[in-house]
From Swiss-Prot:
Biological process terms in GO annotation: symbiont-mediated perturbation of host apoptosis; symbiont-mediated suppression of host cytoplasmic pattern recognition receptor signaling pathway via inhibition of MAVS activity
Region (Disordered): 1-31
Lineage: Viruses, Riboviria, Orthornavirae, Negarnaviricota, Polyploviricotina
Protein's name according to its UniProt entry: Protein PB1-F2
Chain's gene name: PB1
Keyword match Isomerase: no
């Protein structure tokens, strides 16, 4: 593959660098992200996914009808174990 040839991967990972000129105007320059920028992007996306999971979990939690103390305790323990397990594997 030629050095300058764009693949779907490189096209999809292009990002915009915004550089300020001396007079305050902004210019946009397309470029390929470095590893740090890709990691930042990945972490932002994963944060959004985690927030969505937490919201869905709370909605499910709030939808329970007349939960007993024991059933709540069981659910909390299961969720806690699951989140800890996922935290270590990610």
């Amino acid at each position: 593959m030629e050095q300058g040839q764009d693949t779907p991967w490189t096209q999809s990972t292009e990002h915009i660098n915004i550089q300020k000129r001396g007079n305050g105007q902004q210019t946009q320059k397309l470029g390929r992200p470095n590893l740090t920028q890709l990691m930042d992007h990945y972490l932002r996306i994963m944060n959004q996914v985690d927030m969505h999971k937490q919201t869905a979990s709370w909605k499910q939690w709030l939808s329970l009808k007349n939960p007993t103390q024991e059933s709540l305790k069981t659910r909390v323990l299961k969720r806690w174990k699951l989140s800890n397990k996922q935290g270590w594997t990610n």
